[in-house]
Amino acid sequence: MEFLLGNPFSTPVGQCLEKATDGSLQSEDWTLNMEICDIINETEEGPKDAIRALKKRLNGNRNYREVMLALTVLETCVKNCGHRFHILVANRDFIDSVLVKIISPKNNPPTIVQDKVLALIQAWADAFRSSPDLTGVVHIYEELKRKGVEFPMADLDALSPIHTPQRSVPEVDPAATMPRSQSQQRTSAGSYSSPPPAPYSAPQAPALSVTGPITANSEQIARLRSELDVVRGNTKVMSEMLTEMVPGQEDSSDLELLQELNRTCRAMQQRIVELISRVSNEEVTEELLHVNDDLNNVFLRYERFERYRSGRSVQNASNGVLNEVTEDNLIDLGPGSPAVVSPMVGNTAPPSSLSSQLAGLDLGTESVSGTLSSLQQCNPRDGFDMFAQTRGNSLAEQRKTVTYEDPQAVGGLASALDNRKQSSEGIPVAQPSVMDDIEVWLRTDLKGDDLEEGVTSEEFDKFLEERAKAAEMVPDLPSPPMEAPAPASNPSGRKKPERSEDALFAL
């Protein structure tokens, strides 16, 4: 491939890159680094030639001093060059075949090199995540995280996206190095900035590690505070929404906005927690702690809101099911239960009492099938509602109000129950007059017998006959008043079955 395309270091940008990554340099040559950026931006083949030269310097190079210088040049070009160069750098092939290959276990690079490569991949993944044509590095970053690779803590520059500043100083004679060095210091990466006018005094290679504390300058502190203002604004909006919204009655659009704010604030909190342990400025650390406390408070309120909202939805669903089941099937056995007077009872026909259902049974049928057919005519729903309505009353109280408008129902088993009950209740009313008549009869009958000393068998038989005749002369007992008129006439042939039924219940 090199035979066809030529030596990558033979191009103008390749020559500058070879000089800027020479292992004999004591520090980064920012003049050459910025010249490389200018060539990439101004020439058509500059981005491709620069990528070829970087691959040549990075692949299989065991001189990690040159590797660190090449990574510095690569980072500077990404921050100062345009979209044409970004497409080539964020390509999955370049990230996987060059950068990931450097930190592979078989190469066993130093920790400083590993941290540098991982920091670049992480920063580019965050910066290019929203660009559809620059997501190759994002995929590599996600794959490495799934494999368990631990990335270093992000520095302050990760809070702002990578951008390409405009060229600040036109190209001048190389002899005039002072203005050019100042422009280079302004456009280079913040972590490599050096105080003027020391010629190109940049941090040495060991200082490139991103694991130490961060000493932010005034520009970085100002940018950080502007970012914290955004976080405070999001926190305030989220807090106001939680105050106004009622769990279970929120609007769908408001709920969606609240959930989006929660995700955004949680992502911001991760960065803030990372910076708290890294920033050495006490004032900035105090501000970060205050913002973190505000975020924690609003997160607690949001979690409480979500619990109430989910609990309210579950409660409404369960209440709907319970209401439906209670209306149809349940019977509350407590006093004053609404199930006793159910609104459904008024919509149906009055439930028949137990005695009226028994009246429908034909005791004259001798077959079991006839009895079963009589039972099947009864609606189980009516019996169920009747039980729900009359659970507080005894069977005897229910029989008081039973009336029979059908003469045929009198001959049933229910009529025997009712007649027996009514007869037992009616006897005490007429009992005093009957007993008086019997006592008068006994007194008149026994007046002449008080002086007799003995009674013969003939006289005793005669006495029994007279008593039997007197018993036949006793008038019938008056029947108690009934709510409905009794049948006009009852067949005399039914007296014996009624008496037999009375005897049956007496047993």
UniProtKB/Swiss-Prot annotation:
Ranges of Basic and acidic residues composition bias in the record: 498-507
Any single GO BP term: protein transport
Domain annotation VHS: ranges: 20-152
Residues modified as Phosphoserine: S160
Single GO term (MF): protein kinase binding
Lineage: superkingdom: Eukaryota
Domain GAT: from-to ranges: 219-307
Chain span(s) of sequence motif Clathrin-binding: 329-334
Family: Belongs to the TOM1 family.
Keywords, alphabetical: Phosphoprotein, Protein transport, Transport
Gene3D superfamilies: 1.20.58.160, 1.25.40.90
Gene Ontology CC terms: endosome; extracellular exosome; membrane
Residue span of region Disordered: 162-210, 467-507
Name this polypeptide is given: TOM1-like protein 2
InterPro entries linked to this entry: ENTH_VHS, GAT_dom, GAT_sf, TOM1, TOM1L2_VHS_dom, VHS_dom
Organism: Homo sapiens (Human)
Phosphothreonine modification, residue list: T164
Functional summary from the UniProt entry: Acts as a MYO6/Myosin VI adapter protein that targets myosin VI to endocytic structures. May also play a role in recruiting clathrin to endosomes. May regulate growth factor-induced mitogenic signaling.
Domain topic, free-text comment: The GAT domain mediates interaction with TOLLIP.
Tissues of expression: Ubiquitously expressed with higher expression in heart and skeletal muscle.
Entries under PANTHER family matching the protein: TOM1-LIKE PROTEIN 2, VHS DOMAIN CONTAINING PROTEIN FAMILY
Subunit structure: Interacts with clathrin, SRC and TOLLIP. Interacts with MYO6.
